[in-house]
């Protein structure tokens, strides 16, 4: 997978449903050999909550609070727990499952692809390292999460700084393609975040405490403001260096855009979002 040319795509301020539709569409085309492997950077407008494919959104989320805060919900193709996509850069990396040197084991392929993210952080001066749950307490927290929030615990080979999770990613094998996407928070408003979940006040305060102990945003780590453009440039360099890549821009054809538009309807539908 090294020394090759990939597509590079930036789609800023895109709707939640379209963001997920684009990732799935690219995965479909990459699997069929119609597109090269693709690295994508994107942001969300409006801000939104995404839930994992198998997450029980009807149980975990407070729909009244979401409506009051004008925060839509979208269900991802990948698994995992809920993420508030607000002031962040989201990345996705999509390549054929048959790619040489790509491990068939999901955890090991996750570690390999996340190396591009780790090097991106290094470009920004952030000493991010892979997290491996070492204690039984850490492993139990992964088996039995204490909340529906993604960032309150680091899984295998997620990235952390001083023990705090700095990025949350998920991976899926889809029709012959590997899709990994993840959230890179620039800043976090934990008041808005925890208002979105079905918790009483005691549970909410406990979750906020865990979150402050287990997660950190990029601005807080660097103690300065970082922009989407700065982070995207650093992560592009990180992937280039990790895999000796060159990039060419991706522009969708009319036919491809029509396929994306069809998938948008799926991701907007209550049948998909609230199916569990």
Curated annotation (Swiss-Prot):
It catalyses: octanoyl-[ACP] + L-lysyl-[protein] = N(6)-octanoyl-L-lysyl-[protein] + holo-[ACP] + H(+). Coiled coil: none annotated. It is an enzyme of class 2 (transferase). GO terms for biological process: lipoate biosynthetic process; protein modification process. Pfam families: LplA-B_cat. The keyword Zinc does not apply. It comes from the Bacteria. The record marks 165 as: Lowers pKa of active site Cys. Gene3D superfamilies: Bira Bifunctional Protein, Domain 2 (3.30.930.10). PROSITE patterns: BPL_LPL_CATALYTIC (PS51733). Its EC number is 2.3.1.181. Residues 33-247 form the BPL/LPL catalytic domain. The active site is at 150 (acyl-thioester intermediate). Keywords: Acyltransferase, Transferase. Monomer. PANTHER family: OCTANOYL-[GCVH]:PROTEIN N-OCTANOYLTRANSFERASE (PTHR43679:SF2), OCTANOYLTRANSFERASE LIPM-RELATED (PTHR43679). In the reaction, the free carboxyl group of octanoic acid is attached via an amide linkage to the epsilon-amino group of a specific lysine residue of lipoyl domains of lipoate-dependent enzymes. The reaction proceeds via an octanoyl-thioester enzyme intermediate. This is Octanoyltransferase LipM. It comes from Exiguobacterium sp. (strain ATCC BAA-1283 / AT1b). The gene is lipM.
